Amino acid sequence: MDNNQIPKNSPESSAINSAESSPKSNVSSDVLHENHHKEQQQLQQQLQQEQQQQQLPTTPQSEPTQRVNNNEEGIEMDRIAENSNINVPSDVGESSLKTISGYPSSKNTEAGSSSSGKKEEDYNYRSTWVPKLHQELFENPEVLESRRTKQRASNYRKTLEREKEGIKPLDNILEELKANANGLTKAEAQKRLEEVGPNAIPDVKRYPILEFLYFMWNPLSWTMEVAAIVSIALLDWVDFILICALLLLNATIGFIEENTAGNAVEALKNSLVSQIRCMRDGEWVMLPSPDLVPGDVVMLKIGAIIPADCRVIEAEQVKIDQSSLTGESLPVTKKIGDEVYSGSAMKQGEAKCVVTATGVNTFFGRAANLVQETEGHGHLQVILRNIGLFCISFIAIWVLVELLVDFLGYDGYCHGVGGGRCLPLNNALVLLVGGIPIAMPTVLSVTMAIGATQLSKKKAIVSRLASIEELAAMDILCSDKTGTLTLNILTVDEPLPVGDTPKEDIVFHAFLACSEGEDQDAIDKAISNYCRDTYPNVDYSGNEIVKHYPFNPEDKKAMGLVNANGKQFKTAKGAPQIILREADNYKQVGEAVEKEIENLADRGYRALGVSVSYDAPDFKVWHFEGLIPLFDPPRHDTEDTIKRALEMGVSVKMITGDQLAIAKETARRLGMGGNLFTIPYLENNDLGISEGEVIEMADGFAEMWPEHKYKVVDQLQKRKHVVGMTGDGVNDAPALKKAQIGIAVAGATDAARSVSDIVLTSSGLSVIIDAIISSRKIFQRMRNYVIYSVAATVRICTTFGILTVAWNFKFPTIATVIIAILNDGTMLTISKDRVRARNEPDQWNLFEVFTMALCYGFYLVGSTIVFFAIIHDGTWFHDAINLRILTDNELRGLIYLQVSISGLATIFVSRSQGFSYFERPGNLVIFAFVMSQIVATFIGVYGFRGYPHDSFSDNPDYPVHGTNFQGCGWGWAVCAWIWCFLWYIPMDFIKLGVTYILRGKIEPINKDALRKIYGWFGKEIPKEATQVSHKVAEQQAKRDALHAQETHHKSVVTDNKV
């Protein structure tokens, strides 16, 4: 085809030459600058003429075609196609108008007849870059030239409009940035980095003092602060100082531990900072996104998060997801000269861009500066609030009871009341200080922060702390097949040619459609390695890859434009069904090829279709050459890991875009079951059950698109499941964000990682299972501590309330402060306790927590009240074992010791799932318990003196300021220890009984549980559980029923056909 019909100096001519000679259309600042100024005056005049022109009849709207000329000031044929109106100047003749309108004049008919041969010769070429609807423009050079001028005027008008909006033309931007398509030098980039700073949004300025005080700003701390004010009112300065010390101690420990753990996790997050391909000194290098500066030239490909505001200087089928910035639900097509914004995601194609703004100067950065981002209350905060309200309400009830008793003067029960000594306030102070679990927020936040650090050691980096709770509660994991269940190391098997096509041609043409360098994916690497290893003597030098078309999820293929000794051809590789159906030999070989694809799938192979087109220049005719079998072997540990997940109550569902047959074969090899479906089948199934039920019982899904993954997650959530979703690509982002736990696998794109709750740094399903186990242990630590703390509130308030009301026994406030300090110091070690993860998903059940805590608390109240009553009202211990009779002041020391021992020992019961004797605590917990009880024993034996002049008197009318009490001696201390141990033994049976009532079952005692006894002697606890949970067994039964129903349905259909 010659180009004589097109003027040599026209934009069409330059566009054709550009398309034929270069792999990608480059736009430099020199070309744009020259075109812009050269035609400026001419276009301004044309604008004036255009306003006087009359509009003529229109043609129907045609579909847009692909842009050929990327010059912003040239003719853009895709914009012509998108216009619904074709306006022809009034000076064009009537014959021209009739030709365009579809009514050719006789003169034009004759001319067309004389030149029909040439028209047919030129048709194919024009149809590759001009909308078919507008081909008649070429019949009339006058109309075409007018259209060119009109389009250039339209382009200039749009340029002026962009300037008015503050959007400068690309050539102006490059000129202002002092940049070009070759990027910056390293020296210039370093200079600009020092001037503008790193490409990052500055962290919110931290105020350590405010962060420290935040640990004292919660309802529980407020209650303790009220207690401090009450102690001031009582002029009880020792209590005031100790209460303040307790508040400061909790805040200090929480601040230090949380910052230490947070800094460790933040360092790991920083190691995941995205790397951007940037041109420096004329060479492509990988740079961290914070090192980018205005003027840098970067290459963005599918899946990347755009690191800064940029302008496109080269584009290849680019679509950008701007929903996080603009709220647009659909991806936006970007062309040369368009702006792309920081924080957007590349959904399709690749683009070469110049950075125009970084950091706070970006569109996203300016918004971040203007809007104060607020976080909603996390689930843990809601749980803490509810627990705090329960404890405060319980304390308030007993305070009211004591106040009523004291002020109403029930002398029949209380002696010496109404002495005018502020005794009601003193009694209330005891309940406030002893009952408030002041360390709870600190312990739980520290447990979460340290847990995040522990998860990072398991190759799972947590980006949202609340996801630890959700991971522990997860009962369904939708796992990507490639790279997670399999090795993602594809191996090429023997090619299968069609007809007499040589095998080396299939592999060679597939190789020419592969990307090169760091952009290669697993398929490209497998083909490239096979081609070089199998055919090392083949000379590739005569074939130049002019242009590579990357894999597009929409049409599921990749292509290469090749120049072979002056002749051009295209090769394509991709999904075999799509490649096959586009081929000219589909009717001849289609049935046989599709059968072979099924045979390969049955054997666990993935087929890659290969075709070639020599139909230059439009390449519409393709010839299918054959199949390349690919095999991605399962990981060696995947089958065992899936069984392990089932034993833990987590159902693993395969999610893959591969064909159904391949997915079924992979599932069979992994022992996952055979209930795999495609979404179209689910929507139109004949099984007689709803789509949601089938999704719930299915073992996996094949041929999945992004919207299908989202739908699966949504249906499972509607059925009250906690769903985890793995993914790695930009198309997985919606489903990752929808799931309660979005998990970005190793090597995931920036887009996937940005919306994920957990980012894996190692491949394989076992990493996820290890993370689940760790999260359940973290949850168990938090749950155990909450049960202990609520039980302590119930125990202390009820015990001292009854002692005051029934015996007028005033307990010293200082004793409760000491108990709180020792207990809280011990409980801070719970974050590193050695616990056993449950075999079922774990989540907060406050009814169960409060029920267990009330049972423990009232049981321990009984142990203290019975112990007190025997000593206070009788002489059994004196008569039986010859212990001396205690005064009331010495009895206070004994009761202090008994309450301290029995209360802290509760943690051993609450931290275990079965018998506490079989589950050894962590060494740090044991050490803290022993040290705290040594201190408590010495205080109980020798007493405590606050004010030297203040001492308790046996006179019931003597004011009790609560600063002193006498010791009980070693004999009574040993008695208290024995008493506590005897009452401790039945607590495990109480726990198991309550658990059975609430759950309908208890943790089974099996060989593994018994072997845990040896954990006391340092032997390793078996990691894998052996008990399959009731829930998983039920799910497996449902899956079996579904499989049987599907098999029966198929047999009925077969019988009907027969």
From Swiss-Prot:
One GO MF term: ATP hydrolysis activity
Enzyme class, UniProt record, top EC level: translocase
Description of how activity is regulated: Acid pH levels increase its ATPase activity.
Residues annotated as binding Mg(2+): D728, D732
Reactions listed under catalytic activity: ATP + H2O + H(+)(in) = ADP + phosphate + 2 H(+)(out)
Cytoplasmic topological domain: 1-212, 259-387, 448-783, 834-849, 911-922, 989-1058
Role of this protein: P-type plasma membrane H+-ATPase (proton pump). The proton gradient it generates drives the active transport of nutrients by H(+) symport. The resulting external acidification and/or internal alkinization may mediate growth responses.
Name of the protein: Probable plasma membrane ATPase
Organism: Dictyostelium discoideum (Social amoeba)
